[in-house]
């Protein structure tokens, strides 16, 4: 027992193991959450920082001391939960109690409008540089991570030559590599990997994001309005409404509603306007 205490208190491996156990217990639904027994209450502060087209907004969670600590920049992508979601707050507090300054970069276009805004990749590069420059951050121990499309953006941002050599680690949770595969899987309600294929019912947020990406390249405003009304707002369309769609509008509608096979989904995908593929 004494040896275990010494291992935890003195060695880097012991300290890491100890903090990891406390962190996991905090973020999972376990009856005992002991992080608060050993650390002060974290500070949560909204900050702003320059980005190419204006000002970025983020929430920073950190322990209330002046000790420079490791840090991570997180991007939740098209996050419908929002900044004050209990899960988001729990994650920020748990990471900061584990000794990691945690910065959540927020995108108004992606979070509020469920769009995929590639400008956020550049914004993440700027956000990383801002985080690295803070006095409460150890500049040689800064990483970047994300969830879903936010993870994809984080991976691209981390490879940017302006910050790549400074990125200590990357954590990507549920990123996707190929937008074509994502849309085809969502449209056919199946997911596949190599030779394995299984049914998949995509989350409404997934369909909402894809609907926004499809509708914004449709030339007909009535098509855009109908698809937005059905797949973003969750309303029903009448047979008359569907019959009034243009050919390209009907392509988008069928892709989002459901197709009979992946082959059909792929065929419809390649018939979408060129702007979508670009």
Each language-model region and where it sits:
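Short amphipathic alpha-helix adjacent to the substrate-entry channel of hydrolases
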Residues: 86-103
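N-terminal cap/lid segment of alpha/beta-hydrolase-fold proteins
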Residues: 19-70
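Alpha/beta-hydrolase fold nucleophile elbow
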Residues: 135-148
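Active-site glycine-rich loops that stabilize anionic/oxyanionic intermediates
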Residues: 69, 75-81
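Alpha/beta-hydrolase active-site loop
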Residues: 115-136
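Structural cue for short, hydrophobic secondary-structure segments
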Residues: 74-77, 104-106
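Alpha/beta-hydrolase-fold enzymes
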Residues: 156-258
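Glycine-rich nucleophile elbow surrounding the catalytic serine of serine-hydrolase chemistry
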Residues: 146-156
């Amino acid at each position: 027992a004494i040896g275990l205490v010494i291992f935890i208190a003195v060695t880097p491996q012991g300290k890491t193991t100890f903090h990891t156990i406390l962190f996991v217990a905090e973020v999972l639904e376990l009856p005992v959450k002991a992080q608060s027994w050993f650390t002060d209450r974290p500070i949560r502060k909204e900050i702003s920082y320059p980005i190419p087209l204006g000002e970025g907004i983020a929430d920073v969670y950190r322990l209330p001391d002046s000790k420079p600590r490791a840090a991570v920049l997180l991007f939740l992508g098209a996050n419908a939960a929002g900044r004050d979601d209990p899960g988001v707050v729990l994650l920020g507090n748990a990471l900061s109690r584990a000794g990691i300054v945690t910065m959540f970069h927020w995108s108004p276009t992606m979070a509020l409008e469920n769009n995929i805004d590639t400008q956020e990749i550049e914004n993440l590069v700027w956000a990383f540089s801002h985080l690295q420059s803070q006095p409460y951050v150890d500049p040689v121990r800064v990483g970047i991570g994300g969830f879903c499309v936010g993870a994809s953006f984080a991976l691209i941002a981390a490879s940017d030559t302006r910050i790549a050599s400074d990125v200590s680690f990357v954590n990507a949770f549920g990123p996707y590599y190929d937008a074509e595969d994502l849309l085809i899987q969502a449209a056919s309600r199946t997911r596949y990997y190599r030779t394995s294929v299984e049914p998949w019912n995509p989350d409404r947020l997934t369909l909402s994001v894809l609907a926004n990406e499809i509708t914004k390249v449709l030339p007909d405003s009535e098509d855009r309005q109908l698809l937005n009304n059905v797949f973003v707002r969750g309303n029903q369309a009448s047979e008359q409404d569907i019959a009034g769609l243009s050919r390209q509008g009907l392509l988008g509608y069928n892709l989002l509603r459901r197709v009979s096979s992946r082959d059909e989904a792929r065929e419809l995908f390649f018939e979408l306007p060129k702007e979508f593929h670009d």
